[in-house]
Amino acid sequence: MIIAVDFDGTLQINGTANIGLIQRLRQAQRRGDTVILWTCREGNRLAEALLFLQRNGFRPNYVNSNCPDAIARLKGDPRKIFADVYIDDKSAK
């Protein structure tokens, strides 16, 4: 399974790590799932987010890019990140 997860408001909420979500994502990775950090951040702000995640014990498999399996399945690399599950604070409720 491929899981795409946002950073601001999702993995980090008001400067605090969402430990419960981070733990669940680590469990998913141990099961063999792929986790993509899917964020609008770039440059220094993206580097800060990655450092924040590392300090909180999490490293995504990919950052703002499709995984090779998805690229092969889609026969190309579209701009939209392909995932089976999207986790984002802005999702419809």
Model features per residue range: what roles?
Residues 65-84:
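Short acidic, Pro/Gly- and aromatic-enriched capping/linker segments at domain boundaries
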Residues 82, 87-93:
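Asp-based, Mg2+/Mn2+-dependent phosphohydrolase catalytic module
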Residues 1-71:
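Alpha-helical substrate-recognition element adjacent to the catalytic core
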